[in-house]
């Protein structure tokens, strides 16, 4: 017991070496982009009218004055119709995550084994990320020749029909898939943040047991929801100025009667 007690005591004449000070780690720049200000638009209007709304908001945000401008979207034709009509000077970028979902399905169609399909998918995904989508399309054309063209009455689950649709998607968006150039220019390559905002809107308008028999009511809810998700305080400003607000100063009665 005495031995154990003396072992716990500091030894006389023995100096402990000072611990080496660790060099402070250099602060690395954040990899993910930081959101500065988000404004959200939502409407049941036709894409022609909605495109004009987007343009007005972009002008208000002074996006047209930016030295680098990008218009990111999925393969929906109406998105690129809006780009052509209102944002022609913006670099068109197909959302990379949408592109790879088509590549994944194409790899499943072109390979019989899961491991082989994954290997093909990884190679095509890498080539597309490097801006070499033309090579991927060439390989898919070769696979299409092997499978054959679909008949006119082909079912939706026919592999030949699915491959035809995938090739059409890639061909139509080939000019919006120069991801190597976009990365060098510092442009975004995905609309994931916008997809997240859409889900936040859907939580309010597409929830359980929600039915919109009145389109005007749905439009009003969409406007309020979009304003609530915006960072510029547009919803509090609207509520403070709306008719009937308790904080709003009412005009004199003689003016009300007039």
Give the role of each language-model region.
Residues 1-258:
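Catalytic center-proximal scaffold of phosphoryl-transfer enzymes
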């Amino acid at each position: 017991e005495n031995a154990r007690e003396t072992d716990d005591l500091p030894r006389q004449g023995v100096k402990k070496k000072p611990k080496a000070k660790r060099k402070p780690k250099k602060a690395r720049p954040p990899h993910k982009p930081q959101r500065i200000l988000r404004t959200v638009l939502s409407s049941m209007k036709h894409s022609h009218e909605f495109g004009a709304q987007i343009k007005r908001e972009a002008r208000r945000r002074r996006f047209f004055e930016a030295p680098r401008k990008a218009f990111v979207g999925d393969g929906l034709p109406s998105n690129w119709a809006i780009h052509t009509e209102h944002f022609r000077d913006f670099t068109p970028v197909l959302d990379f995550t949408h592109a790879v979902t088509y590549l994944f399905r194409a790899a499943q169609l072109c390979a019989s084994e899961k491991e082989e399909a994954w290997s093909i998918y990884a190679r095509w995904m890498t080539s597309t990320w490097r801006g070499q989508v033309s090579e991927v399309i060439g390989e898919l054309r070769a696979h299409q020749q092997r499978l054959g063209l679909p008949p006119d009455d082909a079912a939706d689950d026919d592999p030949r029909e699915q491959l035809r649709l995938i090739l059409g998607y890639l061909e139509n968006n080939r000019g919006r898939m120069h991801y190597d150039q976009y990365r060098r220019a510092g442009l975004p390559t995905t609309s994931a943040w916008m997809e997240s905002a859409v889900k936040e809107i859907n939580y309010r308008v597409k929830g359980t047991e929600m039915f919109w028999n009145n389109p005007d009511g749905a439009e009003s809810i969409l406007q309020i929801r979009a304003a609530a998700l915006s960072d510029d305080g547009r919803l509090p400003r609207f509520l403070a100025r709306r008719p009937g607000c308790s904080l709003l100063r009412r005009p004199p009665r003689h003016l009300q009667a007039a």
